[in-house]
């Protein structure tokens, strides 16, 4: 069953449908699967409500937290920690390719019996090579940095707030959010692509996204802030957006 994105009412409808299967005996297992952060929009899944519905219907909760582990939550443990529901999530999945250093590989974390089952039945795991020791060591070091200090996380969110404020002052339309992914909305796919190209000529690399990656008529340039960015970097990016917009508008 598929439920509408972040729509708790529709999720309830789908859970009720699952419970009605097999002459009312319900599905053998029910798992609610969601991203922790939706990467094209930068907004967070309503995890408290999802966990409440899981409790009501006896479902498990699985969260793909690829865009949150490392900087969301008090200790960087991700979206469930941010919402205070870590103990109500049964299965975490994620990647080592984003906040944890940009390397390859990923993980599944959960109860021992679930992980043991996946070791035997998870086809991507069964038919994949092991991670290189260098990647494992780099990821462990990144986790130590995340757990050891909140300074980088604080810098990241200051940078995101500064970028949002400055872009708003320059008249750009942004999606609301509290994440370091900041979508700058243009609507028209060709327009977003031309502005991204114009910015690259100024040395600022951004990526335009359009349908079918995002809904029709909601083309955007997705910006991902980093704790490594300085205020000067952010001001330069804002200036490049302004110059790119002006250049495209002038033809």
Residue ranges with predicted function:
Residues 57-60, 67, 72-178, 190:
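Active-site C-terminal subdomain of aminotransferase-like
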Residues 201-204, 213-251:
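PLP-dependent enzyme catalytic core of the Aspartate aminotransferase-like
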Residues 8-9, 36-41, 68-71, 125-126, ...:
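Short, small-residue-enriched loops and turns at beta-alpha junctions
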Residues 3-63:
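Active-site phosphate-binding strand-loop segment of PLP-dependent enzymes
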Residues 154-163, 168-203, 213, 217-218, ...:
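Conserved PLP-binding catalytic core of the aspartate aminotransferase-like
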Residues 8-19, 48, 140, 144, ...:
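Amphipathic, non-transmembrane alpha-helical secondary structure
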Residues 14-17, 46-56, 82, 88, ...:
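Alpha-helical structural signal in soluble globular domains
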């Amino acid at each position: 069953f598929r439920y509408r994105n972040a729509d708790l009412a529709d999720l309830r409808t789908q859970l009720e449908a699952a419970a009605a299967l097999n002459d009312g005996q319900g599905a053998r297992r029910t798992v609610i699967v969601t991203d922790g952060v939706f990467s094209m929009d930068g907004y967070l899944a309503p995890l408290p409500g999802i966990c409440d519905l899981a409790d009501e219907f006896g479902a498990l909760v699985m969260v793909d937290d690829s865009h949150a582990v490392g900087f969301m939550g008090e200790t960087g443990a991700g979206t469930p920690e941010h919402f205070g529901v870590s103990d109500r999530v049964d299965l975490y999945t994620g990647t080592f390719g984003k906040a944890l250093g940009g390397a390859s590989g990923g993980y599944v974390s959960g109860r021992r019996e679930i992980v043991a089952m996946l070791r035997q039945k998870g086809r991507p795991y069964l038919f994949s090579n092991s991670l290189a020791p260098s990647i494992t060591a780099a990821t462990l070091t990144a986790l130590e940095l995340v757990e050891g200090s909140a300074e980088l996380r604080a810098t990241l969110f200051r940078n995101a707030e500064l970028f949002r404020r400055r872009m708003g002052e320059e008249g750009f339309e942004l999606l609301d959010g509290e994440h370091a992914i900041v979508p700058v909305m243009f609507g028209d796919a060709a327009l977003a692509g031309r502005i991204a190209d114009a910015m690259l000529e100024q040395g600022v690399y951004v990526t335009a996204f359009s349908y079918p990656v995002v809904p029709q008529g909601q083309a955007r340039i997705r910006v991902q802030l980093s704790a490594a960015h300085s205020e000067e970097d952010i001001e330069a990016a804002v200036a490049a957006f302004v110059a790119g917009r002006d250049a495209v508008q002038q033809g």
